[in-house]
Regions:
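All-alpha prenyltransferase/terpene-synthase fold signal
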Residues: 1-302
Length: 302
Protein backbone atom coordinates (compact mmCIF):
# COMPACT_ATOMS: atom_id res chain seq x y z
CA UNK A 1 0.00 0.00 0.00
CA UNK A 2 1.54 3.35 -1.07
CA UNK A 3 1.46 6.43 1.13
CA UNK A 4 -1.49 8.08 -0.64
CA UNK A 5 -3.59 4.93 -0.51
CA UNK A 6 -2.79 4.62 3.18
CA UNK A 7 -3.77 8.25 3.78
CA UNK A 8 -7.02 7.84 1.86
CA UNK A 9 -7.79 4.79 3.97
CA UNK A 10 -7.20 6.91 7.07
CA UNK A 11 -9.57 9.53 5.66
CA UNK A 12 -12.35 7.00 5.17
CA UNK A 13 -11.74 5.73 8.69
CA UNK A 14 -12.02 9.26 10.06
CA UNK A 15 -15.28 9.83 8.19
CA UNK A 16 -16.73 6.51 9.31
CA UNK A 17 -15.77 7.32 12.91
CA UNK A 18 -17.66 10.59 12.53
CA UNK A 19 -20.75 8.63 11.49
CA UNK A 20 -20.43 5.96 14.17
CA UNK A 21 -19.95 8.52 16.95
CA UNK A 22 -23.31 10.15 16.24
CA UNK A 23 -26.49 8.25 17.08
CA UNK A 24 -28.33 9.70 14.08
CA UNK A 25 -25.56 9.29 11.50
CA UNK A 26 -24.75 5.79 12.73
CA UNK A 27 -27.85 4.53 10.94
CA UNK A 28 -26.31 5.70 7.65
CA UNK A 29 -22.80 4.39 8.24
CA UNK A 30 -23.23 1.47 5.85
CA UNK A 31 -25.10 3.35 3.12
CA UNK A 32 -23.03 3.16 -0.06
CA UNK A 33 -24.20 6.66 -0.99
CA UNK A 34 -21.51 8.06 1.27
CA UNK A 35 -18.67 5.72 0.33
CA UNK A 36 -18.96 5.16 -3.42
CA UNK A 37 -17.61 8.49 -4.67
CA UNK A 38 -14.25 9.03 -6.34
CA UNK A 39 -12.70 10.74 -3.30
CA UNK A 40 -11.59 13.64 -5.45
CA UNK A 41 -11.39 16.06 -2.54
CA UNK A 42 -9.25 13.71 -0.50
CA UNK A 43 -6.84 13.25 -3.38
CA UNK A 44 -6.66 17.00 -4.00
CA UNK A 45 -5.94 17.68 -0.33
CA UNK A 46 -3.18 15.10 -0.09
CA UNK A 47 -1.50 16.05 -3.37
CA UNK A 48 -1.77 19.80 -2.95
CA UNK A 49 -1.04 19.76 0.77
CA UNK A 50 2.14 17.77 0.30
CA UNK A 51 3.36 20.44 -2.11
CA UNK A 52 2.84 23.03 0.61
CA UNK A 53 4.46 20.91 3.29
CA UNK A 54 1.45 20.44 5.56
CA UNK A 55 1.16 17.50 7.93
CA UNK A 56 -0.98 14.55 6.93
CA UNK A 57 -3.15 14.98 10.02
CA UNK A 58 -4.00 18.57 9.10
CA UNK A 59 -4.72 17.58 5.50
CA UNK A 60 -7.03 14.78 6.57
CA UNK A 61 -8.97 17.20 8.75
CA UNK A 62 -9.37 19.57 5.81
CA UNK A 63 -10.36 16.69 3.54
CA UNK A 64 -12.85 15.22 6.02
CA UNK A 65 -14.59 18.50 6.74
CA UNK A 66 -14.86 19.44 3.07
CA UNK A 67 -16.09 15.95 2.16
CA UNK A 68 -18.89 16.22 4.73
CA UNK A 69 -19.88 19.59 3.29
CA UNK A 70 -19.82 18.13 -0.21
CA UNK A 71 -22.04 15.22 0.83
CA UNK A 72 -24.45 17.64 2.49
CA UNK A 73 -24.67 19.71 -0.69
CA UNK A 74 -25.35 16.60 -2.78
CA UNK A 75 -28.13 15.46 -0.45
CA UNK A 76 -29.76 18.88 -0.61
CA UNK A 77 -29.29 19.13 -4.40
CA UNK A 78 -30.90 15.74 -4.96
CA UNK A 79 -33.79 16.79 -2.76
CA UNK A 80 -34.34 20.10 -4.54
CA UNK A 81 -34.06 18.58 -8.03
CA UNK A 82 -35.81 15.31 -7.08
CA UNK A 83 -33.01 13.29 -8.65
CA UNK A 84 -33.48 9.70 -7.56
CA UNK A 85 -29.94 8.32 -7.79
CA UNK A 86 -26.42 9.44 -6.99
CA UNK A 87 -23.20 7.45 -7.38
CA UNK A 88 -25.23 4.42 -8.44
CA UNK A 89 -27.25 4.52 -5.20
CA UNK A 90 -30.70 5.73 -4.29
CA UNK A 91 -30.69 9.39 -3.30
CA UNK A 92 -31.03 9.91 0.44
CA UNK A 93 -34.42 11.60 0.08
CA UNK A 94 -35.68 8.78 -2.14
CA UNK A 95 -34.57 6.10 0.32
CA UNK A 96 -35.37 7.77 3.64
CA UNK A 97 -37.81 10.56 2.82
CA UNK A 98 -37.45 14.28 2.17
CA UNK A 99 -37.63 15.43 5.78
CA UNK A 100 -34.89 13.08 6.94
CA UNK A 101 -32.70 13.96 3.95
CA UNK A 102 -32.93 17.65 4.81
CA UNK A 103 -31.98 16.97 8.42
CA UNK A 104 -29.09 14.66 7.54
CA UNK A 105 -27.66 17.28 5.19
CA UNK A 106 -27.85 19.87 7.95
CA UNK A 107 -26.23 17.50 10.42
CA UNK A 108 -23.30 16.84 8.08
CA UNK A 109 -22.63 20.58 7.89
CA UNK A 110 -22.44 20.75 11.68
CA UNK A 111 -20.07 17.77 11.70
CA UNK A 112 -17.72 19.60 9.33
CA UNK A 113 -17.37 22.34 11.93
CA UNK A 114 -16.89 19.74 14.65
CA UNK A 115 -13.90 18.27 12.84
CA UNK A 116 -12.31 21.71 12.75
CA UNK A 117 -12.96 22.25 16.45
CA UNK A 118 -11.41 18.89 17.34
CA UNK A 119 -8.39 19.28 15.05
CA UNK A 120 -4.93 19.47 16.61
CA UNK A 121 -3.97 22.51 14.55
CA UNK A 122 -3.44 25.87 16.25
CA UNK A 123 -6.33 27.99 17.47
CA UNK A 124 -5.49 30.60 14.84
CA UNK A 125 -5.70 27.99 12.08
CA UNK A 126 -9.06 26.80 13.39
CA UNK A 127 -10.35 30.36 13.12
CA UNK A 128 -9.14 30.52 9.51
CA UNK A 129 -10.77 27.21 8.60
CA UNK A 130 -14.03 28.13 10.31
CA UNK A 131 -14.14 31.45 8.47
CA UNK A 132 -13.44 29.74 5.14
CA UNK A 133 -16.14 27.11 5.73
CA UNK A 134 -18.70 29.75 6.67
CA UNK A 135 -17.91 31.79 3.56
CA UNK A 136 -18.05 28.72 1.31
CA UNK A 137 -21.39 27.52 2.69
CA UNK A 138 -22.87 31.01 2.36
CA UNK A 139 -21.64 31.23 -1.22
CA UNK A 140 -23.02 27.79 -2.08
CA UNK A 141 -26.45 28.75 -0.77
CA UNK A 142 -26.31 32.04 -2.66
CA UNK A 143 -25.45 30.15 -5.84
CA UNK A 144 -28.27 27.66 -5.30
CA UNK A 145 -30.73 30.53 -4.93
CA UNK A 146 -29.32 32.16 -8.07
CA UNK A 147 -29.89 28.88 -9.90
CA UNK A 148 -33.56 28.93 -8.91
CA UNK A 149 -33.91 32.54 -10.07
CA UNK A 150 -31.69 32.38 -13.18
CA UNK A 151 -32.70 34.82 -15.94
CA UNK A 152 -32.24 33.53 -19.49
CA UNK A 153 -33.72 36.54 -21.27
CA UNK A 154 -30.61 38.74 -21.53
CA UNK A 155 -28.54 36.74 -24.01
CA UNK A 156 -25.47 38.95 -23.68
CA UNK A 157 -25.18 38.10 -19.99
CA UNK A 158 -25.90 34.36 -20.14
CA UNK A 159 -22.30 33.19 -19.72
CA UNK A 160 -21.46 35.87 -17.17
CA UNK A 161 -24.51 35.01 -15.04
CA UNK A 162 -23.92 31.29 -15.50
CA UNK A 163 -20.33 31.59 -14.28
CA UNK A 164 -21.41 33.64 -11.28
CA UNK A 165 -24.10 31.12 -10.38
CA UNK A 166 -22.03 27.95 -10.88
CA UNK A 167 -18.87 29.34 -9.29
CA UNK A 168 -20.86 30.06 -6.14
CA UNK A 169 -23.06 26.98 -6.05
CA UNK A 170 -20.40 24.41 -6.98
CA UNK A 171 -17.12 26.29 -7.02
CA UNK A 172 -17.02 27.69 -3.50
CA UNK A 173 -17.03 24.27 -1.86
CA UNK A 174 -14.69 22.87 -4.51
CA UNK A 175 -12.13 25.63 -3.91
CA UNK A 176 -12.46 25.42 -0.13
CA UNK A 177 -9.73 22.82 0.57
CA UNK A 178 -7.21 24.59 -1.68
CA UNK A 179 -7.88 27.88 0.08
CA UNK A 180 -7.50 26.28 3.51
CA UNK A 181 -4.24 24.61 2.50
CA UNK A 182 -2.63 27.78 1.13
CA UNK A 183 -3.71 29.83 4.14
CA UNK A 184 -2.51 27.19 6.60
CA UNK A 185 0.83 27.09 4.78
CA UNK A 186 1.05 30.88 5.19
CA UNK A 187 0.97 31.44 1.43
CA UNK A 188 -1.81 34.06 1.10
CA UNK A 189 -0.42 35.17 -2.24
CA UNK A 190 -1.44 31.83 -3.76
CA UNK A 191 -5.02 31.89 -2.49
CA UNK A 192 -6.58 34.01 -5.25
CA UNK A 193 -4.91 32.01 -8.03
CA UNK A 194 -5.89 28.68 -6.50
CA UNK A 195 -9.38 30.00 -5.93
CA UNK A 196 -9.79 31.03 -9.57
CA UNK A 197 -8.42 27.70 -10.80
CA UNK A 198 -10.87 25.66 -8.77
CA UNK A 199 -13.80 27.97 -9.51
CA UNK A 200 -13.06 27.64 -13.23
CA UNK A 201 -12.83 23.86 -13.01
CA UNK A 202 -16.07 23.69 -11.03
CA UNK A 203 -17.89 25.71 -13.68
CA UNK A 204 -16.34 23.50 -16.36
CA UNK A 205 -17.65 20.46 -14.49
CA UNK A 206 -21.10 22.03 -14.27
CA UNK A 207 -21.04 22.40 -18.05
CA UNK A 208 -20.19 18.70 -18.32
CA UNK A 209 -23.14 17.98 -16.03
CA UNK A 210 -25.38 20.15 -18.23
CA UNK A 211 -24.38 18.15 -21.28
CA UNK A 212 -25.07 14.84 -19.53
CA UNK A 213 -28.53 16.08 -18.56
CA UNK A 214 -29.19 17.41 -22.06
CA UNK A 215 -28.15 14.15 -23.73
CA UNK A 216 -29.91 12.00 -21.14
CA UNK A 217 -26.77 10.10 -20.16
CA UNK A 218 -26.73 10.80 -16.41
CA UNK A 219 -27.82 7.90 -14.22
CA UNK A 220 -30.62 8.60 -11.78
CA UNK A 221 -31.74 11.80 -13.45
CA UNK A 222 -34.82 12.14 -15.60
CA UNK A 223 -33.96 13.06 -19.17
CA UNK A 224 -33.80 16.86 -19.47
CA UNK A 225 -34.36 17.15 -15.73
CA UNK A 226 -32.91 20.67 -15.77
CA UNK A 227 -35.48 21.78 -18.33
CA UNK A 228 -38.37 20.19 -16.44
CA UNK A 229 -37.23 21.72 -13.15
CA UNK A 230 -36.56 25.15 -14.62
CA UNK A 231 -32.80 24.97 -13.95
CA UNK A 232 -30.29 26.85 -16.13
CA UNK A 233 -28.62 24.48 -18.58
CA UNK A 234 -26.43 26.02 -21.26
CA UNK A 235 -27.45 23.47 -23.87
CA UNK A 236 -31.18 23.96 -23.36
CA UNK A 237 -30.73 27.73 -23.21
CA UNK A 238 -28.99 27.92 -26.57
CA UNK A 239 -31.32 25.39 -28.20
CA UNK A 240 -34.27 27.54 -27.17
CA UNK A 241 -32.52 30.53 -28.72
CA UNK A 242 -32.58 28.81 -32.09
CA UNK A 243 -28.88 27.95 -32.39
CA UNK A 244 -27.95 25.00 -34.57
CA UNK A 245 -26.48 21.97 -32.82
CA UNK A 246 -23.10 22.54 -34.44
CA UNK A 247 -23.02 26.16 -33.33
CA UNK A 248 -24.02 25.71 -29.70
CA UNK A 249 -21.84 22.63 -29.21
CA UNK A 250 -18.83 24.57 -30.53
CA UNK A 251 -19.74 27.68 -28.55
CA UNK A 252 -20.07 25.84 -25.25
CA UNK A 253 -16.99 23.73 -25.93
CA UNK A 254 -14.93 26.85 -26.64
CA UNK A 255 -16.17 28.50 -23.46
CA UNK A 256 -15.33 25.49 -21.33
CA UNK A 257 -11.92 25.18 -23.02
CA UNK A 258 -11.17 28.82 -22.16
CA UNK A 259 -11.86 28.11 -18.48
CA UNK A 260 -9.46 25.18 -18.55
CA UNK A 261 -6.79 27.14 -20.43
CA UNK A 262 -6.97 30.01 -17.95
CA UNK A 263 -6.59 27.54 -15.09
CA UNK A 264 -3.54 25.89 -16.65
CA UNK A 265 -1.94 29.29 -17.20
CA UNK A 266 -2.50 30.24 -13.56
CA UNK A 267 -1.03 26.92 -12.44
CA UNK A 268 2.30 27.87 -14.03
CA UNK A 269 2.97 30.29 -11.17
CA UNK A 270 2.08 27.78 -8.44
CA UNK A 271 3.73 24.60 -7.13
CA UNK A 272 4.15 22.02 -9.90
CA UNK A 273 1.72 19.67 -8.17
CA UNK A 274 -1.15 22.01 -9.03
CA UNK A 275 -0.55 21.41 -12.74
CA UNK A 276 -0.34 17.65 -12.13
CA UNK A 277 -3.66 17.71 -10.27
CA UNK A 278 -5.29 19.53 -13.17
CA UNK A 279 -3.92 17.33 -15.94
CA UNK A 280 -4.15 13.94 -14.27
CA UNK A 281 -7.09 14.23 -11.88
CA UNK A 282 -9.52 17.00 -12.81
CA UNK A 283 -9.45 17.72 -16.53
CA UNK A 284 -10.29 14.10 -17.50
CA UNK A 285 -13.49 14.43 -15.44
CA UNK A 286 -14.83 17.38 -17.41
CA UNK A 287 -14.26 16.28 -21.00
CA UNK A 288 -17.32 16.99 -23.14
CA UNK A 289 -18.76 14.63 -25.71
CA UNK A 290 -18.07 15.98 -29.21
CA UNK A 291 -21.02 16.68 -31.47
CA UNK A 292 -20.13 13.79 -33.77
CA UNK A 293 -20.55 11.19 -31.01
CA UNK A 294 -23.69 12.87 -29.67
CA UNK A 295 -25.77 12.93 -32.85
CA UNK A 296 -27.68 9.79 -31.88
CA UNK A 297 -28.77 11.43 -28.64
CA UNK A 298 -29.53 14.90 -29.94
CA UNK A 299 -32.99 14.03 -31.21
CA UNK A 300 -33.94 13.17 -27.66
CA UNK A 301 -32.05 16.07 -26.16
CA UNK A 302 -33.79 18.66 -28.28
Amino acid sequence: MDLKTSALSRLEGQLRACFFSDSTLADFSDDAYFWSGQNIRGKICLDLGSAYGLSEDALLDIAASTQLLHDASLIHDDLIDEDTERRGCLAIWKKYGKAKALLIGDLLISKAYQIVIQSKVSAATKVVWTSEISAAVSSAVSGAVAELEFDTHNQQLILENYYRMASRKTGALFALPARCIALTADQPGDVDRLNTIFLNLAVAYQIKDDQSDFLGTKSGRQHSSDLKNGRPNLYHIFVNNGMSAEKYFDYIDDYQASLVADSIQLADSLPKQVYVILKELLIPLIELKPLQSSNRLLQVGT
